[in-house]
């Protein structure tokens, strides 16, 4: 178990975790139609920053906002490790931007890059938990980010995977996913933040499975996702879970697979959080962005007495190309 001591989100919906949560609660979506964003690319629906962003500066701002908001002074410590979650970055050698980010903050340790398709943000948090629980570091700064490009958009278009309109996860008439841009940071520690008044969370469990089914299609039985859910639910039951943050891409096969996995795990009646209609698929940032918002949603449920004290667990699950599946369980107070 490790403690979240800080977090932030930067997206087209706003800067800061609270601003993004309020946008979601108000039903505001960042999705819109782009006709001339990239040369020689067909019109597409996505959630992009109005002003094109650069990858490294956006990551740096995300970390700076998180440490400033929570008045943390840990970035240049030998007890702190930086973990970058991204699927594309801005360089074929992803360790280069990771080093630039860590060096900006004067951190003496070699950063870690987690690039595991759409599950990267959850896998990065699992990596942080394992490093802290092993006693290798006291703090881990997990930053997730991806910026869209002509290469990415045209690639998904070639798969016929993009919806021409805002996505509709789990709808019978869903047409595919929308892409998105964001940067988000979660800071984990071996110990809780002293005198914290913030309703943060603990990271209790994590699991990664590969279903070895297909390079770009999930298991039709949801096997990998089910095994992840089974692992993170060890020691608890479905009635102790307040919320499940699903992947919910609105692609035909992913949503069908997730539905099967959730039912196999006995989670079909637990409330779900589906965030792609607000942010699009932010790829390497998705697991970080959506973990923060799921935890904040669950904290609000607890504060509003919508759930009892026993229902304080939150599960966040993701799946990705290559057959990878990942899930984590948080405990919110």
For each predicted feature, which ranges?
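Short conserved active-site loop signatures built around small residues
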Residues: 121
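Short acidic/polar active-site loop segments enriched in Thr and Asp
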Residues: 137-138, 242
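Conserved "HGTGT" condensation-loop signature of ketosynthase/thiolase-family condensing enzymes
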Residues: 1-111, 149, 162-178, 184-186, ...
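Alpha-helix C-terminal capping segments
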Residues: 104, 129-136, 296-297
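Active-site alpha-helical elements of protease catalytic centers
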Residues: 124-125, 187
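Short acidic, glycine/proline-enriched helix-loop-strand junctions
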Residues: 153-162
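Short acidic donor-binding loop at the edge of a beta-strand
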Residues: 138-139, 313
